[in-house]
């Protein structure tokens, strides 16, 4: 074995995420002197089937750090850092639970990411090249969450994310800069209508105006698109995160209590008024049937599962059997290792499910998911508004990849 690639030491650190919460960073060093780090993000709105985070009673991650510095360091020392599958399988066996509850999904994903980044660096490759090899041909379409509600903001909106999607552009940078124009236009509209106070940012960089009704938020976003002159190039989307406003039998939204069947009509009405290409988690995480009904009724819309699937093949299989969704969110920390993430993506692609690689609301400045999205040739990437360093780090990395490697932006070609 080449010592240059062998793991010499693995160390854990406690760091802060973008919400000021503690999370774990893992650093790997090889005998060849190569080192890299991986960070674990954290969500505010979580699916109940996600991998469990290992946290202290006070919210810290000192137990996770201790596990990295002892058990994981001892178990993975001398592994070839290029053996991603072998290392991830060791982490999975070490944990021994179906939801990573012993070692913690945050512990395993930070380690798994650090492994991939160290291997890429040791091989002299960009991370996206290491992941994707010669198949890398295009850059993903960004889904920019420019107006925040739900658990990501302090207003009364139930819908969590109001998204713009810059499809019809010849390059990634043109698409991103146009979306940024819309974002600035939206801030100007809100300043004029509600005052500058309400251009303060939510967790994912979007504005959080004092609204309570979904259509009022959609009107603001659509007006910003039209005022920017991009009505024929930028479409819209929402992440309802509807499990968060489902009371067990009804959805409490816009001052009303709607039955699950009434929610189908609710989304159909929204899609008739606005250019909604994308609807994520329109129903609670167990309602595969109504996901399917909505997807059948809105054939041109990408109904997408996040809490529905939680990057877990078993739930994706169920969704495919029921034709529940055209798209799936991919969040590596939901499943806990990159190898399981790659397996999930491969299965989704084989079944013609669109891939949306996604951040979490609690992020760090690590730009890894930008490389991941390019490497796996994700259709879309979801990483917040064009604001706040933990969001722009991902966009800036995509701009860097485009500039340095001339990789194309397929825009609406991916969808059409």
From Swiss-Prot:
Its main location: cytoplasm. One of its GO terms (cellular component) is extracellular region. Binds a second Mg(2+) ion via substrate during catalysis. Keywords: Cytoplasm, Glycolysis, Lyase, Magnesium, Metal-binding, Secreted. SUPFAM superfamilies: Enolase C-terminal domain-like, Enolase N-terminal domain-like. PANTHER family: ENOLASE. This is Enolase. It comes from Sulfurisphaera tokodaii (strain DSM 16993 / JCM 10545 / NBRC 100140 / 7) (Sulfolobus tokodaii). The lineage of its organism: Archaea, Thermoproteota, Thermoprotei, Sulfolobales, Sulfolobaceae. The gene is eno.
